[in-house]
Amino acid sequence: AQSPWYMENNALDFTMEVPGQIMKCIWNFWDYMGDEEFLRTRAWPILKDLAIFYEAFARRGWDGKQFNLEPTVETESYGVSYQLKYTRNCTGTIAMFRWVLQRACEAAEYLGEDQDLIPGWKEVAENLPPYPKFKVGSGEVVGANEMAFPRFTRGDHFMFTGYFLVNQSDEINLDSPQELKDMM
């Protein structure tokens, strides 16, 4: 049986991390092959356009510091919900926005191109919201979004949300502090 949280809609239109996931595959080709021509002519134009879009999509919050990402829908959980309650600052979106913006800065600096775009990308990447965390019996865990307490019911993909920081953005790895690894 399918989880009642899934429904026929255009929810995937708001899964903003998916373009970043695709970009990561392209970046990994460059990263492993080191083909500068590939970076300059193929990867960079896509990465640059995606970073420009991500910077424009992020909205500065009322505090004047944090950039919020809404509407966003987690790919593994919480489709479009009533009054869009579960569509703000999703973990996968935060992870991939930060990853894309950081790689765009790195590539622009390496290639010596579009230096004027770097400050805006850095500002957004450094001021994205913290990952939503929730206390559970075993400690703190990363949740799908800031309004959605993790659900551990049949049909839900709860286990993937915390792993986004490992398998999508590489923010948590073997060299990370133990307290970060414990949240996965």
Feature locations, PLM:
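Flexible glycine/proline-enriched surface loops and loop-helix/loop-strand junctions
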Residues: 6-8, 78-86, 148-151
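Conserved functional hotspot residues or short segments at active or partner-binding sites
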Residues: 47
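Generic alpha-helix signal with a bias toward terminal, lower-confidence helices
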Residues: 50-51, 79-81, 175, 180
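Acidic/histidine-rich catalytic neighborhood
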Residues: 52-110
